[in-house]
C-alpha cells in the first residue's frame, strides 16, 4: 500500500495506513527533533516516513512480533534505519529519552465494534484497533506518564485519538 510516498507491505498483523496518519506525519515533520519514538508501530509507516524525511534517530515499539517483522521489512525496502523493539507499552517502565513520541494506539471502543466496516474487521488486527470500554484512555495515560521522564526538555507527544474522548485525552 502507499503511505506518504512510500511503498509498504501490510497484512493481517498491521493496520492499513490511512490519510489521517499522513496528516499526523505532516504535523510532526514541522517540528525540530533529533530522536523520535513511535509506540504501536504496526507496519512501521510513521517511523519510516520520519526516517525518510529527517536525519533523526527513530525508534519504534510494538507488542506484536508479527507486526514488527513487517515493519522491519518495510524499513529495509524503503532504505531507512530504525531501531525496532518488541515491547508491551502497558508493561513498560522505561524508555530511551527522545524529543518526540508519537502513537496511534488502540482507541475504538469494544462496544463500537459493530459499527466498524467489515473490511476493517476482516483484514486488520483487533489488537491494534480496540480498547476496553471500561478503560478507553489506558494507552494515552500510560504513554503520558512515561513521557514525563523520557521526553527531553521541550519534547512533544503526538497522538491519533478517538474524537469521542478528545477532551479527556487532552486532560
Where are these regions (language model features)?
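Conserved AdoMet
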Residues: 1-30
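A secondary-structure boundary/capping signal
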Residues: 11-12, 85, 161
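Conserved donor sugar-nucleotide recognition element shared by glycan-biosynthetic enzymes
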Residues: 17, 67, 136, 140
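Proline-centered helix-kink/hinge sites
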Residues: 17, 105-106, 125, 153
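Conserved SAM/SAH cofactor-binding pocket of Class I
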Residues: 23-115, 142, 164
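Class I S-adenosylmethionine-dependent transferase superfamily signal
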Residues: 50, 120, 143-147
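Mobile active-site "lid"/loop adjacent to the S-adenosyl-L-methionine
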Residues: 107-138
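Conserved Class I SAM-dependent methyltransferase catalytic core
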Residues: 133-171
Amino acid at each position: 500500500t502507499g503511505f506518504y510516498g512510500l511503498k509498504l507491505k501490510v497484512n493481517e498483523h498491521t493496520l492499513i495506513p490511512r490519510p489521517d496518519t499522513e496528516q499526523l506525519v505532516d504535523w510532526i515533520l514541522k517540528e525540530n527533533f533529533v530522536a523520535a519514538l513511535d509506540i504501536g508501530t504496526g507496519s512501521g509507516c510513521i517511523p519510516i516516513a520520519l526516517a525518510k524525511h529527517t536525519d533523526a534517530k527513530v525508534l519504534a515499539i510494538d507488542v506484536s512480533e508479527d507486526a514488527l517483522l513487517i515493519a522491519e521489512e518495510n524499513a529495509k525496502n524503503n532504505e531507512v534505519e530504525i531501531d525496532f523493539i518488541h515491547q508491551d507499552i502497558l508493561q513498560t517502565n522505561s524508555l530511551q529519552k527522545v524529543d518526540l513520541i508519537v502513537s496511534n494506539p488502540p482507541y475504538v471502543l469494544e462496544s463500537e465494534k459493530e459499527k466498524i466496516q467489515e473490511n476493517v474487521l476482516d483484514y486488520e488486527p483487533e489488537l491494534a484497533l480496540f480498547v476496553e470500554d471500561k478503560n478507553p484512555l489506558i494507552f494515552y495515560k500510560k504513554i503520558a506518564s512515561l513521557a514525563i521522564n523520557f521526553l527531553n526538555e521541550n519534547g512533544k507527544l503526538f497522538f491519533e485519538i478517538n474524537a469521542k474522548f478528545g477532551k479527556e485525552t487532552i486532560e
